[in-house]
Design a protein with these regions (language model features):
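Acidic, Ser/Thr/Pro/Gly-enriched interdomain connector segments
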Residues: 2-58
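Second-shell loop/turn segments in exported
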Residues: 30-37, 54-60, 79-81, 101-112, ...
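Short acidic, glycine/serine/threonine-rich helix-capping segments at coil-helix boundaries
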Residues: 33-41, 49-68, 72, 76-91
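Short domain-boundary/entry signatures in modular proteins, especially
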Residues: 90-99
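Bacterial extracytoplasmic/cell-wall-associated proteins, especially those involved in peptidoglycan
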Residues: 100-208
Length: 208
């Protein structure tokens, strides 16, 4: 009888374990990093690594190290520090990535403050009634940025580009509110010269 009871108990334990496996798998799946515009978690981890938040081997699964990296990102960008990539964090990551691509494509040869200036122009346009009101719409507005036209936008941003975006998002604006900038040597439309220049940073003139 004792042996029988042990067998019954052991079988019950195994049954519980096997019943729990689907639940565990479902929970693990929920912790994979995914979201609109992202193929898998590796892209987010790679972005976090470029930004200095994550330095482990990149995989597609969520773990403690990734959660810590996400939490640090959230704290730096004013989001609830949940450690999980929900809709708000996903949107912020995407907006930062788009802005970093523009900064890198347009100003990678400029000083850090010049890069901050380009990021500030994007944010100033979002706030202006004369431009679209989202990061994506501003960046991809027709003929708005040379880097989008000539595909330099597709280059992978470096750490400096991300840092410049963060600086601008923190309220630093060396352009004094500019919504335009240009390099006189590369101007193809004289219309830009009709804009009032507010300041010059490196090779870029920033205008209202």
């Amino acid at each position: 009888m004792k042996i029988l009871n042990q067998n019954i108990f052991g079988g019950a334990v195994l049954a519980v374990v096997f019943l729990c496996l689907p639940l565990a798998e479902a929970q693990a799946a929920q912790h994979r990093i995914s979201g609109p515009g992202v193929d898998n978690g590796e892209e987010i981890r790679e972005q976090l690594a470029r930004m200095g938040y994550y330095d482990e081997d990149v995989t597609g699964y969520f773990n403690f190290i990734t959660s810590n990296a996400v939490t640090r990102f959230q704290e730096d960008y004013g989001l609830p520090p949940t450690g999980i990539v929900g809709p708000l964090t996903q949107m912020k990551l995407e907006n930062v990535e788009m802005m970093a691509k523009i900064v890198h494509g347009e100003a990678r040869g400029e000083s850090f403050i010049g890069k901050v200036g380009v990021a500030a122009v994007v944010l100033n346009r979002i706030e202006s009634p004369d431009f679209p009101d989202s990061t994506e719409e501003v960046i991809f507005q027709r003929n708005a940025f040379t880097a989008v036209i000539d595909d330099q936008y597709l280059l992978t941003p470096n750490r400096s580009a991300y840092d410049a975006v963060k600086e601008a998002m923190d309220g630093v604006d060396p352009t004094m509110g500019a919504v335009f900038y240009y390099n006189p040597a590369g101007v193809t439309d004289d219309w830009i010269f009709s804009r009032t220049v507010l300041t010059q940073i490196g090779r870029h003139f920033f205008a209202e």
